[in-house]
Amino acid sequence: MTSKTSESGTGTQSTIVQLRNLPDLTEISHLEIDAPVVEILKKTVLFQLNSLNICISNFALDELVNLVTVQMDGMFRNLHNLTLLQRRSQASQADLKLLLREFNLDAPSLYQQFQASEFIKSKHSTEYEKLMSWSSLAALPHNEEDEEDELNNIEEQQNEINVLLPPSNPLEKQIPSWLPNFPPDHTYKFTPEFNHPITDLKTIKKEIVKESQESEKALLNLNKSLSHISSASNTPQPPGLDDEDAIEQQLEIWGNALEERKPTITEKSFNENNIEQYAKYRVELARERVTKFEVNQLKRTKNPFLKISETLYLPESPHQSHKTIQKTIELQFRKSMTLFMHNLPKVQKLKKEKIRMAKEERAKSLKRRQEELISQRTKREQDEGHDLELLLNNEHARDAADDTTTPNALNNSTIVINTNAEDEDDDINLFGILGSSEDENEMSSMPAENLVAESEPPTMTAQDTTNTTPVAHNTTNIDATTSHSPHSTPNENAPTSPPADIATDHDITM
């Protein structure tokens, strides 16, 4: 042991102690144990190579020895795992068979190598005896005293565990001294416990009654939940505008291929304690499962690949080689491919025909729908025009009756067209229900003089036409207001309703 002192830049001294010889411990080199085993392995490999007249370098020999050690360690490790899985302390013949099958080895090849090694052993007897002497020297002495010490250690460990965790078995005192004690209770913690069958009839009946009550409660809860769901689903929804048209169009395009979903029993409301409906529901479910199973079985019988695989790989089928199985599968695959290529043009032609028919049906349905809409619109316009004509005739008759009393008021009245249809509505609400019409452009192209001449009543004079204000087109609401001139005097005996002035075709938008 040596000690050194050194001074650092800050002025402090540090002492370094170095141990060269261990005073109380004895150092054992690993070469004393590993080197003889490695040397014996090298000599065995060289012994096998010498019998085959093969020369090898030292580097190649080291690599070959490493490869042999890795392979042997893997085999021994796998054998150890197999014995542990089978809960054995030593490897059995079945474990060795599994190991050989895992490494793709068979007994005849091993026996052939054994005969070759026996021949080499007899030919090179002197070298073999030297190798055996080396292996006997490297083996550690094994005495019976060591076995007794190991057994004593196991007993001591067992006693220590029993002291820490004594077993709770009452039969512990009856065990003789030459037998081992019971293990602690934690060893039985994860062992399975088998069910104890009930043989008493009274307890069996009680359990049956209890289970029936629980099932009845479950059925009642199920009925309540289903009734709640059905009541929530039966709430009326706002009707869609084009739902019926869409359904008709789909039926016309796709024909009978469109299958409507049948309403299940779950959509109906279950009453409380109604076991009959629940039983019907269960029967329907069972039928659906049976139909699904039958469809799958039918598909399996029609599928050629599944049929071939079942006939080839079933245990009842005769044994066949892998090549024959592969050939049959390839042959069936080629047949299916040729059939597919043969039927592909037919399928494409059928697909085009179906698409063409669907397009024609869709065009017909759209045309029929358009004609229906046009007929409905024309009928609605005719009805609205007839009603409007009656209203205008009534207003003209009222104006003719009022001409005798208030001529000046009628001469100075004008029509103001409300261009902002969203802010104000007409007082009479005559034109609020009218929509746009396609005849508006045709009417606007006609001369204004003809329109004015057609709309004038027989009692109106030329002075009345000069007092009318210009009319704004494309309006939806008309606000009829009267503007009196300073020369006109109001008439107290006039009717309370607003007078109807001159209405031209430009004023009315259909």
From Swiss-Prot:
Residues 142-165, 346-383 form a coiled coil. GO terms for cellular component: nucleus; transcription factor TFIID complex. CDD domains: TAF8. Pfam families: TAF8_C. Residues 478-495 have a biased composition (Polar residues). Residues 37-103 form the Histone-fold domain. Keywords: Coiled coil, Nucleus, Phosphoprotein, Transcription, Transcription regulation. It is found in: Nucleus. The keyword Transcription applies. Residues 361-382, 459-510 are annotated as: Disordered. InterPro entries: TAF8 (IPR037818), TFIID_su8_C (IPR019473). Residues 465-477 have a biased composition (Low complexity). The modification Phosphoserine is found at residue 269. The keyword Coiled coil applies. GO terms for biological process: positive regulation of transcription by RNA polymerase II; transcription by RNA polymerase II. Signal peptide: none annotated. Belongs to the TAF8 family. In TFIID, TAF8 heterodimerizes with TAF10. The 1.2 MDa TFIID complex is composed of TATA binding protein (TBP) and the 14 TBP-associated factors. One copy of each TAF1, TAF2, TAF3, TAF7, TAF8, TAF11, TAF13, two copies of each TAF4, TAF5, TAF6, TAF9, TAF10, TAF12, and three copies of TAF14. PANTHER family: TRANSCRIPTION INITIATION FACTOR TFIID SUBUNIT 8. Functions as a component of the DNA-binding general transcription factor complex TFIID. Binding of TFIID to a promoter (with or without TATA element) is the initial step in pre-initiation complex (PIC) formation. TFIID plays a key role in the regulation of gene expression by RNA polymerase II through different activities such as transcription activator interaction, core promoter recognition and selectivity, TFIIA and TFIIB interaction, chromatin modification (histone acetylation by TAF1), facilitation of DNA opening and initiation of transcription. Present with 4684 (+/-522) molecules/cell in log phase SD medium. This is Transcription initiation factor TFIID subunit 8.
